A protein has these predicted regions:
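Short glycine-rich, low-complexity segments
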Residues: 1-22, 47-48, 53-60
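SH3/SH3-like beta-barrel fold
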Residues: 14, 37-43
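Short beta-strand-centered aromatic/proline hotspots
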Residues: 24-32
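Structural motif
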Residues: 31, 43-46
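Short, conserved beta-turn/loop elements at beta-strand boundaries and strand-helix junctions
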Residues: 32-37, 56
Length: 60
């Protein structure tokens, strides 16, 4: 639900699970790929299922 309305270039803070536990990352949203269930920041792709929370921090 929180992914709706996000646009490329938005500044977001994503809390997600990886191999080592939960971590947060703030960055510019590169793209949302619903077909692949991926959210991409500049240097990382995060699976939708791993996202615990996402906050919009600024608009492009």
């Amino acid at each position: 639900k929180k992914l709706e309305g996000l646009k490329r270039g938005d500044l977001v803070r994503v809390t997600y699970y990886d191999t080592y536990g939960y971590r947060s990352r703030t960055g510019i949203l590169d793209e949302v790929l619903p077909a692949f269930k991926l959210l991409k920041l500049k240097d990382i792709a995060i699976d939708f299922d791993d996202i615990q929370d996402i906050e919009l921090r600024g608009r492009a």
